[in-house]
Swiss-Prot record:
<keyword id="KW-1133">Transmembrane helix</keyword>
<dbReference type="GO" id="GO:0046933">
    <property type="term" value="F:proton-transporting ATP synthase activity, rotational mechanism"/>
</dbReference>
<dbReference type="Pfam" id="PF00430">
    <property type="entry name" value="ATP-synt_B"/>
</dbReference>
<keyword id="KW-0813">Transport</keyword>
<dbReference type="InterPro" id="IPR002146">
    <property type="entry name" value="ATP_synth_b/b'su_bac/chlpt"/>
</dbReference>
<comment type="function">
    <text>Component of the F(0) channel, it forms part of the peripheral stalk, linking F(1) to F(0).</text>
</comment>
<comment type="function">
    <text>F(1)F(0) ATP synthase produces ATP from ADP in the presence of a proton or sodium gradient. F-type ATPases consist of two structural domains, F(1) containing the extramembraneous catalytic core and F(0) containing the membrane proton channel, linked together by a central stalk and a peripheral stalk. During catalysis, ATP synthesis in the catalytic domain of F(1) is coupled via a rotary mechanism of the central stalk subunits to proton translocation.</text>
</comment>
<keyword id="KW-0472">Membrane</keyword>
<protein>
    <recommendedName>
        <fullName>ATP synthase subunit b 2</fullName>
    </recommendedName>
</protein>
<comment type="subunit">
    <text>F-type ATPases have 2 components, F(1) - the catalytic core - and F(0) - the membrane proton channel. F(1) has five subunits: alpha(3), beta(3), gamma(1), delta(1), epsilon(1). F(0) has four main subunits: a(1), b(2) and c(10-14). The alpha and beta chains form an alternating ring which encloses part of the gamma chain. F(1) is attached to F(0) by a central stalk formed by the gamma and epsilon chains, while a peripheral stalk is formed by the delta and b chains.</text>
</comment>
<comment type="similarity">
    <text>Belongs to the ATPase B chain family.</text>
</comment>
<keyword id="KW-0997">Cell inner membrane</keyword>
<dbReference type="InterPro" id="IPR028987">
    <property type="entry name" value="ATP_synth_B-like_membr_sf"/>
</dbReference>
<keyword id="KW-1003">Cell membrane</keyword>
<dbReference type="InterPro" id="IPR005864">
    <property type="entry name" value="ATP_synth_F0_bsu_bac"/>
</dbReference>
<dbReference type="GO" id="GO:0045259">
    <property type="term" value="C:proton-transporting ATP synthase complex"/>
</dbReference>
<dbReference type="InterPro" id="IPR050059">
    <property type="entry name" value="ATP_synthase_B_chain"/>
</dbReference>
Length: 175
């Protein structure tokens, strides 16, 4: 209906009528009862099941987190142990190398001392042999000189010549 440019709606849903309110309330209650009997149980059980699934996922996530933290701690401990072991091995290696170096140095020192001692002994033996040889030659020269002196009377010039000749003989025999 149209009056003076306004539209009036008769029997509109927005106008409160007692019959409409009554039937709407009854329909609402019936729908609630039907939903409670038919759909409410499955919806609630689905929500509970979903809640259990979410809780289970959360529990598994917490368990996985704790497990990963335990593994991380264990890995850190193993890494610390490995570092300590590596440090120990390096330290022992250095100590062993130092010990070997000291032993080699000591052996080299002992060998050099042996060689020096052997060389000194050899020099001493050569010196003794040379002195013995020199004594023998001097004794031979003295005997020969005495022989020549005994054979004849010598004057100073002759004695000088004899001594010079013995020295020359000595130097020729040594070479």
């Amino acid at each position: 209906m149209l009056t003076s440019g306004n539209i009036l709606l008769a029997g509109s849903l927005l106008s409160p009528e007692p019959g409409l309110i009554f039937w709407t309330t009854i329909t609402f209650v019936l729908v609630l009862i039907i939903l409670k009997k038919i759909a409410w149980g499955p919806i609630i059980s689905a929500l509970e099941e979903r809640e259990k699934g979410i809780q289970s996922s959360i529990d598994r996530a917490h368990g996985a987190k704790e497990e990963s933290e335990a593994i991380l701690r264990q890995n850190r401990e193993l890494l610390a142990k490995a570092d300590a072991e590596a440090d120990r091995v390096i330290r022992e290696g250095r100590e062993y190398a130092e010990k070997i170096r000291a032993e080699i140095t000591e052996k080299a020192h002992q060998e050099s001392q042996k060689m020096i001692s052997a060389a000194k002994e050899e020099i001493e033996q050569e010196k003794r042999r040379a002195l013995a040889e020199l004594r023998n030659e001097v004794a031979d020269l003295a005997v020969r000189g005495a022989e020549k002196i005994i054979r004849g009377v010598l004057d100073a010039d002759v004695q000088k010549k004899v001594v010079d000749s013995m020295i020359q003989d000595l130097s020729t025999n040594r070479n």
